[in-house]
C-alpha cells in the first residue's frame, strides 16, 4: 500500500516538476533494478529531497530535518504531505542519538531491498561549494554491502526564492556509476574502508555536480 501511494504521489507531482523546472536527468541506467542501494547526493536546497524521488525510477527513502514537519506555511504543509508520502525519516540535528537512529533506519530499509538516499555533507550548502562528506553513506555501504550510487545535482538552489517564487534556470540530475564496497580489500578494517569509500563518494559527487570543493585553493592563491 505504501509503495502504491508513493508512486501515486509521484505520478501526480512529476508533470508539475517537468512543467515548471524541466530537469535534465541522465544516468538512470545506473540505478539497480532490484535490491538495496544507497543514493549519495550533494545538497544545494531543501527542494533536493523533492526532486530526487521524482527524478529516480525506483522508490527511495531519506532523512530530512524534523523542522520541515513543523512549518506552518502553505509550503510547509505541502512539504510535510510529500515527505510523509515518500516515508522520509525525520532527524533532530541537535541530537547525536537521532543521527545514529536515522542511519540504523536506513540500514533496515536497505536490508529490505529498498533504496535509501543520504546527503554526505550533512546539510545543504549555503555557498554553493561541495563541503567535506561525513561517513554516513560509507557506513551504510560497509554494513549492508549495498552499492552507493553517486548523484550530482546542479541548479536546484535557484528554483525558489526566499518568498517561494519560482526562478528559471537549468536544473540537472546526474546519476553516476555504482560504487561497490566489494571493490575495497575486505581484509582492511571497517574504519579504513569507510574512509576510502567516503573519499571516493565525494570525488564522484564532485565530478557529477561540477562544484568547487570548500577549502580548495583557487589559482594564484
Annotate the PLM regions.
Residues 4-5, 35, 100-221:
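Non-catalytic C-terminal accessory region of glycerolipid acyltransferases
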Residues 18-20, 57, 83-85, 143, ...:
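Short, well-ordered coil/turn elements that cap or connect secondary structure elements
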Residues 11-43:
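Helix-to-loop junction immediately C-terminal to a conserved catalytic motif
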Residues 27, 64-65, 87, 119-121, ...:
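A secondary-structure boundary/capping signal
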Residues 2-21, 80, 84-87:
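Short hydrophobic helices that act as membrane-entry/anchoring signals
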Residues 25, 76, 100-103:
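Structural motif corresponding to alpha-helix initiation and N-cap regions
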Residues 21, 96-100:
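A conditional alpha-helix N-cap/helix-loop micro-motif detector
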Residues 33-96:
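Catalytic core of membrane glycerolipid acyltransferases/transacylases, capturing the structured
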Amino acid at each position: 500500500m505504501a509503495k502504491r501511494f508513493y508512486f501515486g504521489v509521484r505520478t501526480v507531482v512529476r508533470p508539475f516538476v517537468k512543467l515548471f523546472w524541466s530537469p535534465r536527468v541522465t544516468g538512470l541506467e545506473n540505478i539497480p533494478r532490484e535490491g538495496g542501494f544507497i543514493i549519495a547526493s550533494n545538497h544545494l536546497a531543501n527542494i533536493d529531497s523533492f526532486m530526487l524521488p521524482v527524478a529516480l525510477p525506483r522508490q527511495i527513502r531519506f532523512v530530512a530535518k524534523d523542522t520541515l514537519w513543523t512549518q506552518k506555511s502553505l509550503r510547509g504543509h505541502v512539504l510535510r504531505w510529500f515527505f510523509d508520502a515518500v516515508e522520509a525519516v525525520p532527524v533532530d540535528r541537535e541530537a547525536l542519538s537521532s543521527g545514529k537512529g536515522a542511519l540504523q533506519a536506513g540500514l533496515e530499509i536497505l536490508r529490505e531491498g529498498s533504496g535509501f538516499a543520504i546527503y554526505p555533507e550533512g546539510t545543504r550548502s549555503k555557498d554553493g561549494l561541495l563541503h567535506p562528506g561525513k561517513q554516513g553513506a560509507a557506513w551504510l555501504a560497509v554494513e549492508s554491502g549495498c552499492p552507493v550510487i553517486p548523484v550530482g545535482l546542479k541548479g536546484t538552489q535557484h528554483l525558489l526564492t526566499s518568498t517561494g517564487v519560482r526562478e528559471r534556470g537549468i536544473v540537472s540530475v546526474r546519476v553516476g556509476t555504482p560504487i561497490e564496497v566489494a571493490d575495497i580489500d575486505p581484509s582492511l578494517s571497517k574504519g579504513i574502508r569507510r574512509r576510502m569509500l567516503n573519499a571516493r563518494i565525494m570525488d564522484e559527487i564532485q565530478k557529477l555536480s561540477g562544484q568547487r570543493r570548500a577549502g580548495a585553493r583557487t589559482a594564484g592563491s
